[in-house]
Amino acid sequence: MSQISAKDVKHLRDTTGVGMMDCKKALEETGGDMQKAVEYLRKKGAALAAKRADKDAREGIVCIALGDDHKAGAILELNCETDFVARGEMFTGFAQELVSLALAKHAESPEAVMGLELSEAYGCEKVEDAIKTMTGKLGEKIDLKRLMFFEAQDGIIEAYVHPGSQLGTMVQLVTDQPEKAKELAKDLAMQVAASAPLVTDRSKVPAEYIEKEIEIYRQQALGQGKQEKFIEKIVSGRIEKYYQEVVLTEQVFIKDNNTKVSDVLNEFRKAHQAQVDVKAFVRYQLGE
């Protein structure tokens, strides 16, 4: 067996990010051949990924990348098994690499990004293989749980990541004054993070769902012995409260408890003689 030098072990460690002892073992198994040692470690990572496929990966981070002109954005949730790994530079760097790739290639789902090649820093591996390699390096199951891409040729995209990177949001505005709308978009991204709306406006709430809610509230009122003449008003009030909870534009603005989000949008329109509407938003919270 050829002599394995510390220099070779360090070089392999720097190249792959795998632990020193595993690098030494790989070089020993491949007779000191650096390329074969790299392939050996990749196969070992794939084998470990297969072994850990049934493990729970509930820790991780939410990561976001925005284009320089804020016309595009990508958000993802990358999972691992422990909080220790989730906070490490290797894991967070990998998450940033993935979301940057998704942004650059306009990938709209985990499936869409799996066949794409990463940068030279990750050996130009395809994402699917790189996840296996990362599993080998970190010794934990790595799972790209979800990913979404926004594009706004007719507006602007802003984002917010809460400290700790376990909650992130993106908001897409349609506006003819994108530069002036940046601060508004940032505020709305924070609004989505804090208040967790489900839809942008009332029209997005399915009519059949509201009908079911009305019947539920009606039966509850009857069960409480409310008089028939008061029930309609009670039900209407509860439906309004529901809208205020789940509809973004109906929510109380986080920066002013006396103002609704819809009022903030109207104020912007008047102040800047501009058109602005919320086209879409996304909210990722770790584990949801």
UniProtKB/Swiss-Prot annotation:
Xref: Pfam families: EF_TS
Known function: Associates with the EF-Tu.GDP complex and induces the exchange of GDP to GTP. It remains bound to the aminoacyl-tRNA.EF-Tu.GTP complex up to the GTP hydrolysis stage on the ribosome.
Family classification: Belongs to the EF-Ts family.
Database matches in SUPFAM superfamilies: Elongation factor Ts (EF-Ts), dimerisation domain, UBA-like
GO MF annotation terms: translation elongation factor activity
PANTHER family reported for this sequence: ELONGATION FACTOR TS (PTHR11741), ELONGATION FACTOR TS, MITOCHONDRIAL (PTHR11741:SF0)
The gene coding this protein: tsf
Name of this protein: Elongation factor Ts
Predominant location category: cytoplasm
Key words, A-Z: Cytoplasm, Elongation factor, Protein biosynthesis
Location in the cell: Cytoplasm
Signal peptide positions on this chain: none
